[in-house]
Structures are given as structure tokens and as C-alpha cells.
């Protein structure tokens, strides 16, 4: 679609995401002069982010591309990415991955984790401490709605975090408040090429059904729903951050591993909160609601030294040793 780079005079002030990046540029200290690493799939969103970053930091930007080899078009995506980066003169690093989920694991989740690991590895090779991701407001709304369908708690309702660390590398989403449709319209108006992933049309996936069936109905009934839903996600993120602070303080009180008597002195909601926090820190997979409730019942029943606890939590086990 169009040329690989903007044609004619470019009105950069009309780029929907430029203001957010400019604020980042204005807030940077003199010491922050490392590479600006952008995760670049070749799609519209990452193309818009790479182009905007290239405009602001032409000597520092680099592109990172992960080929998942999950569909026949993957090789075409990589060829497109290589051609665009060559046209723009942007350094590019590419990594090939082949996600192989275990029998009970989700291919989507395994592929996503493989992508983060690959991006972190590419960023280290490039000397970058942070990878920029092009998720926008509509992506955040889809994530929130997907979490609601799964009965998620605050961590899920908070949506995608603006900042996070994985595999020793920071990940930044500067455009969670930016309209994705406006980004695509800007690219089209300036003749910038991008690829459309055919898997995004596959409505066997829940996220795609939300995108193609639910969001248009919400848009028709509640035109400002994307802004208000994204605001709800920000409120949930703030509340979750507060719970994390409280859990860390409670963990200092009850010790690690938790002392049963000190844990019992907390209210049940605080027990649940600190147990989730401790299990995450211990590297356990997320406990189900049923598992957590069973753990709380057994903790409440511990009134003698001989009372034992042994139950499955996530993919591991929780048990009592002595007074712990």
C-alpha cells in the first residue's frame, strides 16, 4: 500500500502519536542517549511508531523484528520489514523463533513470551535498555474486554502496563492513549506502506471477535467508549499498584515464607492479596480463585501445631512446615 516512506511534504504535526513521543523526548536527560529500539512487525501500528521515532531520533533509532514462523505470510512480513528499513536507512535486527507449546499451553501465550524473550535479546545486542511497543488505545480496550470475559481481577482489568520489565529489559508503550484508527489514517494519507496480518481476521480467536463484532457495536452506541474504557484501565492499574505496595508491606510483617500466626492476624482480603504477591515472587504460576480460596480456608483452620497444609497452587504445591 503506497510507498515505503512518506511522499511529498510531511505534516509531522498531524501525526497522531508524535505529541506523546515529543513529551518523552522533552523529558529525557542528557545521559539518556542510547539506542531507541522499536519492535517492528511491519504492521500499521509499529510502522507509525518506527517512523515517528525515526523523525525524532534519526541517528539513534533501530528496529527489532521477530519472525514467529507461525504462518506462511511470516516470510513476506520479514522481507517487507527488511525492505522498509533499507529504504529508510534504519538499522534492523531480526530473530527467528519457533514457539512449541506444551500440550496444555496456549500457542498464543507461548508465542507472546517467545517474542518478548527474542526482543529482549535483540535489544541487548543493540545496546538498548528499553524496547518500544506500538500498542494503542484500541488494543488496551480489547485487552480490558478480554480480561472481563475471563473474570479477571485488578491485574487483568488494568490492561497492558505502560512500563514493564521482562528478561532484564524494559518495555515501554508510549501510545496507550493514542487512537489506532488515526495512526492508520495518517499512514494512508502519506502513502506509507505496511502489512496487514491475515491472522487478525481469524474470528476463531476471542480477541478478533471482540475487535470485529463487539467494538463496532460499542462505537455505535457509546462513541467515546474507547477513551472511557482506557480510563477505567488506568484507574484499575492505580488500584493494583496500591495493592502491590500493601502486599509488600504485609510480606515484611509476616515473613518469607509466611508465618501462619502473623498471616492469620490479617483480614482475609489482605491474606489473599499477600499470598498472591508472595506466590508471584516465588515464581509460582497464578493460583486459580478456587485454589486461593482453599488455601485461605486451610490457613484459617490452622489452630494447632500439628495442623498440616498441602495443596496444589498453580503448577506447584503449598505446604506447612513447623510454625510457617
Regions found by a protein language model. Give the residues of each.
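A broad structural signal for alpha-helix termini and local helix breaks/kinks
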Residues: 57, 126, 222, 279-283
Amino acid at each position: 500500500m503506497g510507498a515505503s516512506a512518506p511522499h511529498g511534504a510531511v505534516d509531522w504535526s498531524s501525526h497522531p502519536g508524535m505529541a506523546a513521543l515529543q513529551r518523552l523526548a522533552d523529558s529525557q536527560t542528557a545521559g539518556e542517549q542510547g539506542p531507541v529500539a522499536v519492535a517492528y512487525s511491519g504492521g500499521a501500528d509499529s510502522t507509525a511508531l518506527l517512523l515517528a521515532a525515526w523523525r525524532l531520533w534519526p541517528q539513534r533509532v533501530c528496529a527489532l523484528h521477530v519472525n514467529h514462523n507461525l504462518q506462511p505470510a511470516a516470510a513476506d512480513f520479514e522481507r517487507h520489514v527488511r525492505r522498509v528499513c533499507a529504504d529508510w536507512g534504519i538499522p534492523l535486527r531480526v530473530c527467528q523463533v519457533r514457539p512449541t507449546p506444551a500440550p496444555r499451553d496456549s500457542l498464543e501465550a507461548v508465542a507472546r513470551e517467545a517474542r518478548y524473550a527474542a526482543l529482549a535479546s535483540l535489544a541487548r545486542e543493540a545496546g538498548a535498555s528499553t524496547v518500544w511497543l506500538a500498542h494503542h488505545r484500541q488494543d488496551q480496550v480489547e485487552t480490558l474486554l478480554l480480561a472481563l470475559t475471563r473474570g479477571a481481577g485488578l491485574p487483568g482489568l488494568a490492561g497492558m502496563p505502560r512500563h514493564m520489565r521482562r528478561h532484564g529489559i524494559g518495555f515501554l508503550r508510549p501510545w496507550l492513549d493514542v487512537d489506532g484508527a488515526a495512526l492508520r489514517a495518517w499512514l494512508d494519507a502519506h502513502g506509507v506502506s505496511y502489512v496487514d496480518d491475515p491472522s487478525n481476521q481469524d474470528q476463531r480467536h476471542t480477541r478478533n471477535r471482540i475487535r470485529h463484532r463487539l467494538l463496532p457495536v460499542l462505537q455505535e452506541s457509546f462513541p467515546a467508549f474507547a477513551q472511557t474504557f482506557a480510563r477505567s484501565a488506568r484507574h484499575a492499574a492505580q488500584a493494583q499498584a496500591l495493592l502491590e505496595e500493601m502486599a509488600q508491606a504485609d510480606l515484611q510483617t509476616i515473613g518469607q515464607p509466611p508465618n501462619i500466626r502473623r498471616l492469620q492476624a490479617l483480614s482475609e482480603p489482605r491474606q489473599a492479596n499477600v499470598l498472591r504477591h508472595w506466590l508471584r515472587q516465588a515464581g509460582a504460576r497464578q493460583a486459580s480463585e478456587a485454589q486461593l480460596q482453599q488455601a485461605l480456608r486451610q490457613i484459617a483452620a490452622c489452630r494447632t501445631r500439628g495442623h498440616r497444609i498441602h495443596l496444589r497452587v498453580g503448577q506447584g504445591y503449598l505446604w506447612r512446615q513447623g510454625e510457617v
